[in-house]
Each structure stands twice: as structure tokens, then as C-alpha cells.
Amino acid sequence: MSFFPELYFNVDNGYLEGLVRGLKAGVLSQADYLNLVQCETLEDLKLHLQSTDYGNFLANEASPLTVSVIDDKLKEKMVVEFRHMRNHAYEPLASFLDFITYSYMIDNVILLITGTLHQRSIAELVPKCHPLGSFEQMEAVNIAQTPAELYNAILVDTPLAAFFQDCISEQDLDEMNIEIIRNTLYKAYLESFYKFCTLLGGTTADAMCPILEFEADRRAFIITINSFGTELSKEDRAKLFPHCGRLYPEGLAQLARADDYEQVKNVADYYPEYKLLFEGAGSNPGDKTLEDRFFEHEVKLNKLAFLNQFHFGVFYAFVKLKEQECRNIVWIAECIAQRHRAKIDNYIPIF
């Protein structure tokens, strides 16, 4: 039986894989986007979305509709779909789905700490957190003054505790330390998720490893570019690079020595797919940003996950494609609301 994993994959996971493939069929097409960008008002946008799989998800919202309400409802719909899958998942799929939520938990913790640093009330901040990364202790984050307090009082009983070992210090939480904590948590998270996927092996590893390798490398590039002109030393910068990407080890060593954007671009030149991304990015009006090029490549990798069956990668890919779809709809909605149509086509097409 071990020679035919698909025979027993469907016993525990067949229903959910069928479900996620059905949900993926409802991802907006290019024709849908062409309709959305022609909308004159957010009410028009709502009507067009009703003709898609989103249906009446905005039916109970009073006029005038706002972009923030659309954003909240998009996230809410995605979370309902995800939690349905999580509630019906057996191990090891249950743990795999939990791993997907950890990145949102990290983002929520950082958002709460940063907001508290700027004297924002916790009641104002919690609604801004992503519902996929919510956890019981979230509202107590504002009591922590140092990373050690943050860990001991709040995060020790959450899944993030395992990723926090390299962040514990008695230094005060300031802007620089918060960014270091964010990137250290993401490094530990990505390396742990990568290890989990390699242990699962098979088609899941084949689908997930390239996706996580790209995510690790993207973070290394962005950390390097964002560190220019800051107080972050090259040694500290190197400690933040995830070690599960294709850049490890030679590319990361070169990034650690980089002094400007051109030197980062030179590192990318050694990796054909990254070279293409950097060459396609520019800072002139009408050019795509490097971030957009990264998003496009991420969409491409996630679409590839659906080409094979009997693996968990489709669940991760679906969440990431829906996340990009939410960004696209919110971008179009913002352009309509602000009557700034010149850049309305700057969304990332999926299908």
C-alpha cells in the first residue's frame, strides 16, 4: 500500500481536496476583473461581485458601502472557508493547516506591538488584525515592554512560542527591535514549515518546497533592500535571512555584504528566475514594482500546485491565491472610491 499513497490519501483527505479544488474554481477570472474595473461606484462593484462565487456576501451591508467594509467581508468569507476545512481535517493535514495560520499570527502580534508603541488603544487595533491569525491572548500584547515580557506573559502558551527562542531579550520594544522580531519570527516559522513539509515528503514536499524556498528568498531580498540607510548592521541583517531558500548559502552570504540595490540585483543575476523578476521591475511611472513582480511569481508558483493531486500544497496555494484576490478587489475598490482610475489596472491577474 505504501507504493500507492493516493489509495489511502482519499480516505482522510479526499473530501477536503475535492472541496478546495471546487473553491479554487470560483477564483475570479480575467473577465471578472475586466467587469470590475469598469465599475463607477462601489455599489456597482457589489453588483458585479454578486454574479461571481462571492454571491450576496455584501447583502447585509448598509449604504454607503466603504472599502474597509469590503475588505473585512472578503477576509471573513475566506476565513469561514478555511475554518470549515480545518474543522474537518485529520492529521497531518490539520497540523499543515495550522502552519498556514501562524504567519497571520505573527503579523497580528507585530501590528499590536507597533500600534501600542504609537499609543493606539488595543480596542482600536484588534479589529485591524487578520481573523485567520487571531488567538486568545492577543488583547494582552500591550502590557509587554520587552521581548522577554512579550514571550513570558503572552506568547509562551501559543504556537508562536517555538519561533520566539531567538527573540527573547530585555531590550525595550522600539521600531527597530519590532522589525527584528518580525523577521526573526518569520525566519524560524519558514524554516520550521519547510522542515515539516520535507518530513511529509512525496507530492506535498514537491509542491510546497519551491513555494517556501521562494518565500524565504523574497524575504532575504526585501530585508536587505529595506536595511539600506538604517542602523541595522550587516551582521545583524544576515541573522534575519531564512536558510531554507535557493539563495542559501552563497546567495545569502553575498546579500549580507551588499551595500546598495545594484549589488542586490547582481546577486539575483545568478538565479535565472530572480534575474527575470528584477529585470521586470522599475521605479518609473507605469513600471511594475519589485513587490508586484514578487506577487506575480508567487501566484504562478501557487497555480502550479494544482497540477498534481493527492497532496496538501493545494490548501496553502488556495489560501494564498484568495489572499491575492482580496488584495486585487480592495485595490480596485480603492481606485473607484478615490476616483483615481489611472492605476486601476495595477492588480495581479490570477487566471
UniProtKB/Swiss-Prot annotation:
Which GO terms fall under biological process for this protein?
Answer: cellular response to increased oxygen levels; cilium assembly; intracellular iron ion homeostasis; synaptic vesicle lumen acidification
Its GO CC terms? apical plasma membrane; axon terminus; centrosome; clathrin-coated vesicle membrane; early endosome; lysosomal membrane; proton-transporting V-type ATPase complex; proton-transporting V-type ATPase, V0 domain
Q: Which InterPro entries match?
A: ATPase_csu/dsu_sf, ATPase_V0-cplx_csu/dsu, ATPase_V0-cplx_dsu, V-type_ATPase_csu/dsu, V-type_ATPase_csu/dsu_dom_3
Fetch the SUPFAM superfamilies from UniProt: V-type ATP synthase subunit C
Residues that the record marks as modified (Phosphotyrosine) are Y270
The set of disulfide-linked cysteines is none
Q: Any idea which residues bear Phosphoserine here?
A: S283
- GO terms for MF: protein-containing complex binding; proton-transporting ATPase activity, rotational mechanism
Q: How does it sit in the membrane?
A: Peripheral membrane protein
Localization terms from the record: Membrane; Lysosome membrane; Cytoplasmic vesicle, Clathrin-coated vesicle membrane
What top-level branch of life does the organism fall under?
Eukaryota
Q: Which Pfam family name is an example for this entry?
A: vATP-synt_AC39
Which keywords appear in this protein's UniProt record, sorted alphabetically? Cilium biogenesis/degradation, Cytoplasmic vesicle, Hydrogen ion transport, Ion transport, Lysosome, Membrane, Phosphoprotein, Transport
Name the organs or tissues of expression: Ubiquitous.
Q: Which family does it belong to?
A: Belongs to the V-ATPase V0D/AC39 subunit family.
Subunit text: V-ATPase is a heteromultimeric enzyme made up of two complexes: the ATP-hydrolytic V1 complex and the proton translocation V0 complex. The V1 complex consists of three catalytic AB heterodimers that form a heterohexamer, three peripheral stalks each consisting of EG heterodimers, one central rotor including subunits D and F, and the regulatory subunits C and H. The proton translocation complex V0 consists of the proton transport subunit a, a ring of proteolipid subunits c9c'', rotary subunit d, subunits e and f, and the accessory subunits ATP6AP1/Ac45 and ATP6AP2/PRR.
- Protein function: Subunit of the V0 complex of vacuolar(H+)-ATPase (V-ATPase), a multisubunit enzyme composed of a peripheral complex (V1) that hydrolyzes ATP and a membrane integral complex (V0) that translocates protons. V-ATPase is responsible for acidifying a variety of intracellular compartments in eukaryotic cells, thus providing most of the energy required for transport processes in the vacuolar system. May play a role in coupling of proton transport and ATP hydrolysis.
| Protein name (record) | V-type proton ATPase subunit d 1
Provide the species name.
Answer: Mus musculus
